[in-house]
Amino acid sequence: MFPHYNIIQNIEFGAERNKKNKNLTVHEVIKFLNLEHVKDKFPHQISSGEAQRASLARSLLSKPDLLLLDEPLSNVDQSFKEEIQVKLKQILTELKITTIIVTHDSYEAFYLGTKCGIILDGQLKQYDDPYNVYHFPNSVEVVNFLNRGILIPAKVTGENSLENYDLGTIKGNFIKHYPKGSDVQLLLQPEDLEHDDQSNLKLEVVDRKFRGTNFIYTLKTLSNLLIPVFVHSHHIHQHEVDEKFGIRRPINIDHIVCF
């Protein structure tokens, strides 16, 4: 931002560059980005999060043909970030601005993007819609980068089944064909296992994180695998660390991803 302009002058600079933009006003963008209380201040007088939002406001008002945003909300308080994400997505859609967003926050990418690209070591490893990137990662590298599950050893036992030493039989639809007897690495995501205290398959709870709408349990198997499992926070049977956690059998996964 220009240091000799106050915040509203900096934002208005974007509007002046595109006077034909009638869909979004300076007042509207200041309000939705919660900048009303700092609009008369200068850049050196505001926080990094406020400066980041002011820069975003100016960019939106200029209505470019292509907008590149590098970690646009990295300094925004978490309590306010989700609200901005909703409004930002709405504005980008309404103004039909083609936007490339660079972020390390996969959830932010999944929400804001119609397409997601995973870039590792300067190479584009996967480019697809967010659902497919999450549920059908195309390599171990992408799985490790997203960090939304664990790869466990298994043996293919049939067209729709495989076997794991700790979990037993797992059934589902293979995304890729593997001959019977193949040794594979199965992607197990936190939502793939269901809690059932009546089950004879019990795993030890080694960690529990409360995330508002759900708990994320980390369970240890006999072979010392650490498996994450989601459980809704309203679930009546909550478990503490060192307790046993039942896993429903048979284990059924909609789509089986292996490597």
Feature locations, PLM:
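Short glycine-rich loop/turn motifs that provide flexible caps or phosphate-binding loops at active sites
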Residues: 13, 47-48, 146, 153, ...
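Long, contiguous hydrophobic alpha-helical segments, chiefly transmembrane helices and signal peptides
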Residues: 1, 145-146, 217
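Short, solvent-exposed coil/turn linker segments
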Residues: 42, 101, 129, 153, ...
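Non-catalytic connector elements of ABC transporters
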Residues: 149, 160-259
